Amino acid sequence: INVKRTVPLGLALLAVSNPMNVGVIDALSKMSHDPDGEVATASIISLGLVAGGTNNSRVATSLRSLATYYSKEPGLLFAVRLAQGLTHAGKGLVTFSPYHPDRTVCHPVVLAGIVSLMHILLDFDSLVLGKHHYLLFVLACTIRPRMLVTLDEDLKPLPVSVRVGVAVDTVGQAGRPKTITGFQTHTTPVLLAAGERAELATDEYLPLTSVLEGVVLLKKNPDHVPSALDEGKKTKKPGGKDDPISPSQIGRIAKPLSHW
């Protein structure tokens, strides 16, 4: 029985803040109706961890139905409310994942907080529903922002174009291989989902860090050469092609046409 209670926690540990793993969500949804209350509790909170900070609509709908299903069981209803809080944490701007967005480096403090929470959930009724509910504050060390914000050297917001796509493993590859695939171009600030990586779409600025996540400082690139499009925008004179036609110009154009 004890081994069965750890299965949902192990599944959640594999996909923290990664609701794109549909198989894990399906398995946890089935186990959330288990006759064993401990298994159901662990499955419900695991659903919240898998969708933590993502506002995932599928998990949110499942948790709302579970709140109705367990409306007369206070312990399980508390677990559902906790899972809902994890799902909508930070209004979708934070993550609980121990990995950085491109899943290349693990954050040890976040991993320690997640593992500590797993140990607490092994005895949820005695600890959290007893006198030690404050143990849930270990979640505080697991919360990290998942947005990318760019600032200039004066710490003022600096919107720039970035390409966001699925991270590609480039370890051991020669030359300068592509680091992302299937990218889309956005203007900062942007949100990075699990497994995504961002890179600057312009060489006008240089990042002061090699990993684009969280708050990134940018500085002007001294070797940047403005493109012809940028020069055209700066040197455009009044009366150009896009200027509106004045009434006097309309009269001069229409006067010769009146002879026809």
PLM features per residue range, with description:
Residues 1-260:
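Long internal repeat-built scaffold domains in very large eukaryotic proteins
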